[in-house]
Each structure stands twice: as structure tokens, then as C-alpha cells.
Amino acid sequence: MASSSAKILLPLSLLFTLLSLSQSTNPNFILTLVNNCPYTIWPAIQPNAGHPVLERGGFTLHSLTHRSFPAPNAHWSGRIWARTGCNYQHGKFYCATGDCGGRIECDGLGGAAPATLAQFVLHHGHADFSTYGVSLVDGFNIPLTVTPHEGKGVCPVVGCRANLLESCPAVLQFRSHGGHGPVVGCKSACEAFKSDEFCCRNHYNSPQTCKPSSYSQFFKHACPATFTYAHDSPSLMHECSSPRELKVIFCH
């Protein structure tokens, strides 16, 4: 769901310094997904190329429940998001936001924009670092935070707690039922206008030419600790050494 495509992609520039594997890993490291929303969601997990699919790539998570599972015990990178408004239509599974090709188990497929995205690079560097961040580059569909537990270092909680559906500018609103239903997502400017400037493509594909817009500033003002455009500050990815758990909380 990167920009104008229907895939969620971790910005490659954030991975260049994260490629060395750690020498030892925490054998009890787990990932936990928590649904604090007053409705059911369908979390999805997509690995980057060459890494294994976790939990078959997606599942149902009812309101006020959680699901924990072992983190990979070797270097892994990928992304997690929530699908919302899912049901069966004419015998086919479909989600209003974050849909991954009409299936409950995404099995490595990316999701459709807009969707709030948690990004991870696990087990890298000399101190078994896990790096994590939250991106609104491809829009917003649900509040989401990442909380590390029992790691070494600063290990901050990051993410977007605000419900941007209530304040999303009209031009960015994404509505269900073919655009005639309620607002279920807030699109990025790239998704809304498809321009090279907003999508940071071609001439604009560099830190010097890809700049924040009034639309990305809307996201940044509401959720300052998130990525809001393609060349936003790499410092928004945070490192935590040997955490016991990384917890993704929807509707914190």
C-alpha cells in the first residue's frame, strides 16, 4: 500500500543501517496484538521479502481481546496493520480498510490504503536491537501504538492515539460503500491526488525535494511521533535492545 500502489511498504531508506544480524537473541521474545477498540478488527502481518509469514498473515481479533505469539528468533522485518469493517459479500471476504485481496489470512500480501502501519526490524546489531515505528505515510484507519516491555535502552512508546476519522479534511476522507458510507479512513495526499510531488516520486524522490505538505502536517500535528511523508525523519524509528515483548495496541 505504498503511496499510489495497493501495497504497504517499509521505506527502504530506513533499512540501510539495519542489515547486520545480532549474535544472540532473546528466546522468550513475543509479539502481542491488543484490540482495545469497541469493535472487531482483523490484524494483518506482512513480512519483507525473504522473511517468513507470521500467524499466516492475519486473523480475527474481537473487541477487548489480545493475541500473543513467538517473535521470530532470527532477523525479521515487516509490518502490521488492522483491517476494519470486514464481512462476507456475495460469498467473498472483504474489508472496508486494509483489505489484502479478500482473505482473512493475508499470507504475505500487502493491504489497501489507507491504513495505520506499525513497522518493525527485529534482531539486528550487536545488542539484539528491535527497531519499530508507526507510519501514516499511506493514511490512517485506526489509532495504533507500539509499546516495548522489559528492553534495554530508552524504548519509548510510539504511535498515534488520536482518532483522525473525526477531523480528517474532506478531500482526504475515505468512505465505505463505494464512497457513500461513513468515513472509515483518512487518505494520504499521495493516495488522494496521485501526484509525483505528494507521492515523492521521480524528481521528488529525495530528502531535498520531498517535503512535508499541509496534508502531511495535518497528520503530524495530531500524531507527531509518526512518519507522515516518504522522507520524514529516520529518527522516528526507535531502537530497543532485547525486549521481552513488543505490544501493538489498537485504539489505545
UniProtKB/Swiss-Prot annotation:
Localisation per UniProt entry: Secreted, Cell wall
Signal sequence coordinates: 1-24
SMART domains: THN
Keywords annotated in UniProt: Cell wall, Secreted, Signal
InterPro entries, alphabetized: Osmotin/thaumatin-like_sf, Thaumatin, Thaumatin_CS
One GO cellular component, as annotated: extracellular region
GO biological process assignments: defense response
Major localization class: secreted
Name the record gives this protein: Osmotin-like protein
